[in-house]
Structure formats: structure tokens, C-alpha cells
């Protein structure tokens, strides 16, 4: 092989190896920062992984909020109008957290099917709905045949 071609082949091989390593490192870093969203229906059907950081959300079921008077622990149910999931959280809830409102929580689903949240986010006004919750509510509406308003009034 001609020395110039050999040198060119080595340079191209080195560039390909460096780019492959860079892409691999970026993919590894991004994999650890991806938090997938699961609706209460998906969680109830076993689609959500256990003990992995995920996001879950829905509408807070009216009358489901239970606070511990001695600690900052709170438990409440969220629904997509098909299934309910219990969320446990230790901390101060957002000011906009209310029963009947949409929330998104980040945390882990334990072996008992209870979502242990490390962060709870509430919607910021009466018109905003997180896209994940909007999609979950539309899917629930399609499968039950009821309007979201009529189902929401029961919760």
C-alpha cells in the first residue's frame, strides 16, 4: 500500500473511532437523564418499570389527599379517569396543588404499586394542562366514550 494512502486510512480510522466514542458517551449521558411519562392506566397495567425514576401524572382525585400532621408526608390519588394511582410525597407541595387539578410527579414506582414522588409539579393556571396529562385524558375519553368533563365531575 502506498504510504500516503496508508496515512490517510489511519487518519480516517482514528476519526471514526473518536466520533464513535463521542457518540457513545453522549448516548450514555442522555440515557441517565430521560424520565419517561406514564399515565395511571399504564402504571396499573404494569407498563411502568419498578424502582426506576419516571414521571407520572393525572388529575388529583377529590377527597384523596391525606396529610400527616407530624411530618411533611402527604399521600393522594391521581387518575386519568380510568385508573387511580396513589402517590406518596415528603415535602412541601406547590402552592397551586389542589384536588381536581392536574399534576405531574417525578419519582419511583415501588413494588406495592405506590408511586414515591421526589418532586410534584402543579399546573400554573386554570387553562394550562401538561401535554402528557392532556393526551392521557383524551385516550381515556376515547376508550370510555364519556366526555372528560362528565368523568372529571365524579372525581
Curated annotation (Swiss-Prot):
Cited SUPFAM superfamilies: Heme chaperone CcmE
Membrane topology: Single-pass type II membrane protein
Positions with a binding annotation for heme: 124, 128
Periplasmic side: 30-155
Main location group: membrane
A single GO cellular-component term on record: plasma membrane
Keyword list, A-Z: Cell inner membrane, Cell membrane, Cytochrome c-type biogenesis, Heme, Iron, Membrane, Metal-binding, Signal-anchor, Transmembrane, Transmembrane helix
Subcellular localization(s) per the UniProt record: Cell inner membrane
Transmembrane feature ranges: 9-29
Function as written in the Swiss-Prot or TrEMBL entry: Heme chaperone required for the biogenesis of c-type cytochromes. Transiently binds heme delivered by CcmC and transfers the heme to apo-cytochromes in a process facilitated by CcmF and CcmH.
Annotated family: Belongs to the CcmE/CycJ family.
Protein name (database record): Cytochrome c-type biogenesis protein CcmE
Gene that this sequence comes from: ccmE
